Amino acid sequence: VGSEMCIRDRVYEESQPFVLGLTTGRTPLGLYRELVKRHHEGQISFRNVAVYSLDEFYPIRSTERQSRNYRIHEEFLNHIDILPENVHIPDGTVPEDRVSEYCASYDHSVRRIDLMIIGVGEDGQIGFNEPGSYSRSRTRLVQLTYNTRKIQSGAFFGLENTPKMAVTMGIDTIMRANRIILMAWGEEKAHIVQRVVEGEITDQVPASYLQAHQNIEVVIDENAA
């Protein structure tokens, strides 16, 4: 990933940054730490990189420790030289009567993603595209399933405090990326990885839609294989 950004940085003009789609959670932490390490060693600069984050809880303030905004800054963005104006993260504080308009605007701003980094959930979701998500879905406000909220509830100190909704890039938005890296670690992901990679394409396993992408790499550890 770092090498790819360095190569593109040499051929892109400043008006055309390398556009990186990012996710949060445990899955990409190792990658982010490696990119930060390479940055501190002088191997990579992020000044010609723009990032678009995949999703955010709703409603939530960016200063709350459980927010995607807070986490991606703490885990990655605060440790590199990316320009603040090149950071794009869904806003979890948009008034409810403006959410649809905001989501359409965010989706429109994601005109080009050079590389999308994503993980896969235990139910086959990507971002907050839960089972049942439409293949042509765009950035939108979604209802979180009970299972997703239960998984997230530890961070929110109880299910009753866990948001019931989220803003997420849609399947179609993700599929527009020029290249996708899908990552999964651990034995608990082995079953869903098999369905994503070898199973039928179905809305019940949203990540299975990625089989139709022309330039995707699946990176897993031995336990998830």
Label every model-predicted segment.
Residues 1-7:
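Short, small-residue-biased leader/transition segments that mark boundaries at the very start
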Residues 14-41:
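Glycine-rich N-terminal segment of FAD-binding domains in flavoprotein oxidoreductases
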Residues 17-18, 27, 31, 105-133:
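A glycine-rich beta-strand to alpha-helix segment
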Residues 21-25, 53, 90, 117-120, ...:
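Short beta-strand segments
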Residues 34-45, 68-70, 131-140, 199-201:
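A glycine- and small-aliphatic-rich helix-loop capping segment at beta-alpha/alpha-beta transitions
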Residues 44-117:
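Ligand-binding beta-strand-loop-alpha-helix segment within the catalytic cores
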Residues 123, 127-171:
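Class I SAM-dependent methyltransferase SAM-binding "motif I" and its flanking Rossmann-like core
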Residues 169-172, 176-225:
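ATP/nucleoside-binding phosphotransfer catalytic cores, i.e., glycine-rich phosphate-binding loops
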